Curated annotation (Swiss-Prot):
Residue numbers covered by motif Nuclear export signal: 102-123
Higher taxonomy: Viruses, Monodnaviria, Shotokuvirae, Cressdnaviricota, Repensiviricetes
Taxonomic source organism: Mungbean yellow mosaic virus (strain Vigna)
DNA-binding keyword on record: yes
Cell location: Virion; Host nucleus
Family in the record: Belongs to the geminiviridae capsid protein family.
GO molecular function (one): zinc ion binding
Tree of life domain: Viruses
Protein name per UniProt: Capsid protein
Signal sequence segment: none
Length: 257
């Protein structure tokens, strides 16, 4: 077979099949004769090596299981109705009992990969008739050195004129408390522009590594490192707000237990 000359070899465009394999997504490839679902599964980006995936997958990748942990993914829920006032309230969201179930920790160490806060804030019949606007400030805080009982909102945060919207962690506590996430929700009372309830739905990835002592009970006092606390406070001084929340954490056990 005679060889092609230089002009023919380098001026002929690349074949369509090769161009598609190089630049297009696998889902845009033409279906071959006698193709089966296994071939479509084999062409997905998730089943290809990292060097053959698009650049997006190489830059923004995160493992399903946190570093130093093992599956399965466990879950723990905290469901309660809270009375949120101007002075604030705090709850610990890493209270997990030691055990062998899907909602228990197997040892002292586990990692909270993500947290989901869902529910609503609302006003009762007597408060929603008053003309006012009330905003609830939520702050998810990491306590690096838990001890005793959780500190109150005013003990952790420095506020100007006792206003929760101006709350910042006190200077002498910044090495212990870290605000991981913060969000807010607003309700309005009155006769005309009334909004008596507001939906709260927040999902955050935190990757917080929690350490317990040798005790089995799910208590704040049994934490030794990195407890997660949810602080809540409303901006109105005289009208409280009720919060019906379901807080769910997704965590993995550490391989060093």
């Amino acid at each position: 077979m005679p060889k092609r000359n230089y002009d023919t070899a380098f001026s002929t465009p690349m074949s369509n099949v090769r161009r598609r394999l190089t630049f297009d997504t696998p889902l845009s490839l033409p279906a071959t004769a006698g193709s089966v679902p296994a071939s479509a599964k084999r062409r997905r980006w998730t089943n290809r090596p990292m060097w053959r995936k698009p650049r997006y997958y190489r830059l923004y990748r995160s493992p399903d299981v946190p570093r130093g942990c093992e599956g399965p993914c466990k879950v723990q829920s905290f469901e309660a109705k809270h009375d949120i006032s101007h002075v604030g309230k705090v709850i610990c969201v890493t209270d997990v009992t030691r055990g062998m179930g899907i909602t228990h920790r197997v040892g002292k160490r586990f990692c909270v990969k993500s947290i989901w806060v869902t529910g609503k804030i609302w006003m009762d019949e007597n408060i929603k008739t008053k003309n006012h606007t009330n905003t609830v400030m939520f702050k998810l805080v990491r306590d690096r050195r838990p001890f005793g009982t959780p500190q109150d909102f005013g003990q952790v945060f420095n506020m100007y004129d006792n206003e929760p919207s101006t709350a910042t962690v006190k200077n002498d506590l910044r090495d212990r408390y870290q605000v991981v996430r913060k969000f807010q929700a607003t309700v309005t009372g009155g006769q005309y522009a009334s909004k008596e309830q507001a939906i709260v739905s927040k999902f955050y990835r935190v990757n917080n590594y929690v350490v317990y002592n040798h005790q089995e009970a799910a208590k704040y006092e049994n934490h030794t490192e990195n407890a997660l606390l949810l602080y809540m406070a409303c901006t109105h001084a005289s009208n409280p707000v009720y919060a019906t929340l379901k807080i769910r954490i997704y965590f993995y056990d550490s391989i060093s237990n």
